[in-house]
Structure formats: C-alpha cells, structure tokens
Amino acid sequence: MSMACTKVWRSTMYTPRRLKRTTPASRVSSTAMAAANGDASHGANGGIQIQSKEMKTAIHSNDSPKTLLKSESLHEYMLNTMVYPRENEFMRELRLITSEHTYGFMSSPPEEGQLLSLLLNLTGAKNTIEVGVFTGCSVLATALAIPDDGKVVAIDVSREYFDLGLPVIKKAGVAHKVDFREGAAMPILDNLLANEENEGKFDFAFVDADKGNYGEYHERLLRLVRAGGVLAYDNTLWGGSVALEDDSVLEEFDQDIRRSIVAFNAKIAGDPRVEAVQLPVSDGITLCRRLV
C-alpha cells in the first residue's frame, strides 16, 4: 500500500484515509455539520496521502484528534500536561459524552475551549455570540468564563445535539447564561441587527458553522461586536488543506470547504477594520479584534 501512496503535501496536518461515510450528510442537522465530515487518520509524517487517483481523502473524523500537530505524542503531552489537569469537571463530562457521539469530531477540542476561556477572561467579556453549537462544549466553556450576569447567544439550526449537552450545562449551574436560538444563523443575526441597541452590544463572538457563510457572518458580527471586541473563527486551516495547490485529491465536500476557507482567509487578511492573527490551534483558529 505504501508504494501506491502519493504524498502531495508535507506539513503539520492530518493524514486522511479513504472516506467511509455510512450516514448521509443530510441527516446531520446541526450547523456544526459543515465543520467536518469523513474518515481520517493522523499520520506520523504529516501530509495528505492518497492510495490512488480514484480514492478521495476526507479531512476529519472520530478516528483522529482535531489537531495540526504532526506528532501525536506531542499532542498527548500537551493535553496531559496543560489541558486535562486544569479542565473543569463539567467540561470533562461533556467532552466525554460528546466523544461517544457519531459526529463527536465536530466538537471544539479541549485545548480550544481552554484558549477561548482565557481570551474571554483577558477581554472581560460579558455578552457573547456563538454561531454553531453542536453539543455545547464551547458554549459551556464560554458560560463558565463570563460573569454571572453575562449571556451567550448560542445559535444553531437544530437543538438536537445541544440537548445532549444541556443537562451538563444545567448541572454546571450556568444554563441561565445561555440564550439558545434555533434556526439558520443569518436571519437570526439579521434580527439582532434590526434592533439598533444590539449594535456594538457584544464583547466576543465565536463561529464554528457553515464555512461558505463565514464572510457574511463576519460582516454582521462586526456590527454586533463592539470596537475592541474579539471575533474568533474556527477551522480556518481545514486540516492543512488550505496550502494544497491541487485539491482534487480531496472529497468534493472538503474541496468546497477548503475553497470557502481560502477565500475567507484572504478576506480577513485584507480587512482594515480588524487586527487579526491565525493560530495553528486545533484545526486553525483566526482571532480578529475589531478596530473601528
């Protein structure tokens, strides 16, 4: 098999396997579905590998950690040294529940939740927005970090998966901080903007939803988040595939997402309204501070 493999890119990214989808994508009702789908494995040497021209690769699955680190042992070291020992008991409970789910790979990994919590505390955020919720791991991280009178407006096209995590959020004593809104994100954001009092009301926004709409979400969130506030966008390196010159080796699903992410990255890179940084945490996270 190794003789048939063609290495098309070498870097700190997943080494995906041939796709083995058993559930139609249409059955995944959460907006977080667009974050990932497929069957991937993490290779020691990094890079996307394909077995033949007929075999397509997929970026994410439950079979591999959502990380861009080339070394799995290094990722484990980081988790065991800095993440798990400091993990809130309710965050751990929800993480373990989510990991057993068929689409558990769509969840924000614990190191990303830790980063979000730190950012929220550093910025003193009180009112936040989250687009794309899934089981609520990042919502819980946010609710635990913001003050008792803070709010996270959590938006997802379906509450099916959120209901899996809601009992843990309630047990953590932070359910009163969560304002879950079911439906497509665009009209919900537009409805928020219809009330002028919401412009500049929010301190922080986190987006982990349909990648094709990231640019549109950005325009709306720039009006909802105050000057000096932070906007965070997940999956902006998409398994490292953004660096591919030829994405024909990818599943069509991943090709579409890759192209959307590449366009979004270019948009942020040239946006004078924000100060931005892209970090290789998890699957890539882009942080923007609104300047004007």
Curated annotation (Swiss-Prot):
Q: Which PROSITE patterns match?
A: SAM_OMT_I
Q: Cross-referenced Gene3D superfamilies, in alphabetical order?
A: Vaccinia Virus protein VP39
Which cofactors does this protein require? Mg(2+); Mn(2+)
Tissues expressing the protein: Expressed in stems only.
The record's listing under InterPro entries reads:
Cation-dep_OMT (IPR050362), SAM-dependent_MTases_sf (IPR029063), SAM_O-MeTrfase (IPR002935)
* Reported impact of E112L: 40% loss of activity
Ligand binding (S-adenosyl-L-methionine):
S108, E130, G132, V133, S138, D156, A185, D210
For the ligand (a divalent metal cation), the binding residues are: D208, D234, N235
Q: Which GO terms describe its biological process?
A: methylation
Q: For the region Disordered, give the residue spans.
A: 21-46
Which segments show compositional bias classed as Polar residues? 23-32
Q: Does the keyword S-adenosyl-L-methionine apply?
A: yes
What does the record's cofactor remark say about binding?
Binds 1 divalent metal cation per subunit. Fully active with Mg(2+) and active at 70% with Mn(2+). Active at 40% with Co(2+) ion and less than 10% with Ca(2+) or Zn(2+) ions.
- Which keywords fit this entry according to its UniProt record? Magnesium, Metal-binding, Methyltransferase, S-adenosyl-L-methionine, Transferase
Q: Which reaction does it catalyse?
A: tricetin + 2 S-adenosyl-L-methionine = 3',5'-di-O-methyltricetin + 2 S-adenosyl-L-homocysteine + 2 H(+)
Protein EC: 2.1.1.175
Q: Name one GO molecular function term.
A: metal ion binding
- What is the similarity comment for this entry? Belongs to the class I-like SAM-binding methyltransferase superfamily. Cation-dependent O-methyltransferase family. CCoAMT subfamily.
- Free-text function comment from the UniProt entry: Catalyzes the stepwise methylation of tricetin to its 3'-mono- and 3',5'-dimethyl ethers. No 3',4',5'-trimethylated ester derivatives are produced. Can use caffeoyl CoA, 5-hydroxyferulic acid, luteolin, tricetin, quercetin, myrcetin and 7,8-dihydroxyflavone as substrates, but not naringenin, apigenin or kaempferol. The 2,3-double bond and the O-dihydroxyl group of the substrate are both required for catalytic activity of the enzyme.
**Stated name of the protein:** Tricin synthase 2
- Name the species this protein comes from: Oryza sativa subsp. japonica (Rice)
